[in-house]
């Protein structure tokens, strides 16, 4: 077990690793990288007890099992909150260390998930292509709230979701606002409501809607502020399981926070190319997001806001 291993070159601030039961290893790691202060807690259950555990500080471990042990089944629970929650998650999802039982449940869950769109006709290859693409639409976002509802917020405090609601992260919004998010309004409205409530929680903890959130932080990656188009699309389609007044407030405030040349955009209707990179792309995407705000404000009867943002949306003509 090696807590020093990283996929990217993140800075590791803190590691903890300990034996917590005859067949359990648990710990945590805090890193600085694409997002700051990323916490991962884990609890790993093994189907066989350890014969020996050599801990190399708080960072690595060498596990030894009895000579007759040939097969191990391991269940690893994860949490952004605590080892206790990680263990709770693992026991809730994998109560028994039975690989075949877990596999059967996973097959059933994937069949249900992929069954929200049913197609008929076409060749086997075309069906394979379609359902492979459908599978890819299910890989994100990531569920961040634990089975008890707790999750780590962007301000690093721990909160709890109300019963029946879930907190999500990993919103690659610049990549998804055009197609993936509108698709979800057709096939999974419960997820759409959970995502928007999660966005509003991020707004509460940071003062701004997310741009590209990951785990318990914001990467600030890519351009635009496309959370507003996701919210407006849902609202205009009648998906409204969140505080719409608060959502509109968050959209307006986020549109006026300076990022990647948006101060020039707000002041003069475009971003000069000799001052900021990606000036045309940023101008076009800010104008689109302003149009989304205008449409939602209009639907809510906020004509004052509609007029201002309909005017801002016309900035696309400047490039």
Label each PLM-derived region with a short phrase.
Residues 169-297, 310:
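Aromatic-rich carbohydrate-recognition surfaces in CAZymes
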Residues 139-145, 204-210, 259-260, 317-319:
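Secretory-pathway/luminal and periplasmic proteins that interact with or process carbohydrate-rich
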Residues 130-137, 199, 251, 313:
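Short alpha-helical scaffolding segments that buttress acidic/His motifs in well-ordered protein cores
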Residues 36-41, 45, 49, 60, ...:
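Conserved active-site and cofactor/substrate-binding residues in soluble primary-metabolism enzymes
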Residues 1-168:
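Beta-sandwich/jelly-roll carbohydrate-recognition scaffolds of carbohydrate-active enzymes
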Residues 119-122, 147, 195, 303-310:
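Surface-exposed patches in mature extracellular/periplasmic domains of secreted proteins
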């Amino acid at each position: 077990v090696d807590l020093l291993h990283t996929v990217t070159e993140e800075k590791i601030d803190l590691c903890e690793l300990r034996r917590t039961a005859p067949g359990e290893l648990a710990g945590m790691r805090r890193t600085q990288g694409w997002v700051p202060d990323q916490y991962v807690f884990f609890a790993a259950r093994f189907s066989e007890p350890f014969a020996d555990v050599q801990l190399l500080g708080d960072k690595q471990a060498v596990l030894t099992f009895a000579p007759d042990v040939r097969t191990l089944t391991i269940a690893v629970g994860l949490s952004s909150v605590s080892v206790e929650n990680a263990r709770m998650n693992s026991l809730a999802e994998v109560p028994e260390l039975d690989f075949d039982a877990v596999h059967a449940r996973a097959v059933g869950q994937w069949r249900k998930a992929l069954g929200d769109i049913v197609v008929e006709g076409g060749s086997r290859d075309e069906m394979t292509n379609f359902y492979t693409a459908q599978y890819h639409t299910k890989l994100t976002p990531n569920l961040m709230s634990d089975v008890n509802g707790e999750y780590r917020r962007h301000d690093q405090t721990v909160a709890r979701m109300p019963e029946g609601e879930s907190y999500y992260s990993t919103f690659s919004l610049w990549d998804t606002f055009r197609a993936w998010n509108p698709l979800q309004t057709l096939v999974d409205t419960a997820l759409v409501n959970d995502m928007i409530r999660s966005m509003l929680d991020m707004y509460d903890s940071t003062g701004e809607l997310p741009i590209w959130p990951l785990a318990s932080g914001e990467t600030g990656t890519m351009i635009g502020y496309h959370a507003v188009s996701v919210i407006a699309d849902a609202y205009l389609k009648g998906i409204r399981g969140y505080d719409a007044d608060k959502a509109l407030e968050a959209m307006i405030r986020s549109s006026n926070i300076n990022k990647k040349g948006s101060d020039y955009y707000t002041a003069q209707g475009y971003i000069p190319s000799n001052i900021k990179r990606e000036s045309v792309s940023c101008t076009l995407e800010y104008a689109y997001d302003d149009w989304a705000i205008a449409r939602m404000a209009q639907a809510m009867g906020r004509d004052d806001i509609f007029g201002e943002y309909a005017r801002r949306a016309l900035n696309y003509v400047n490039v």
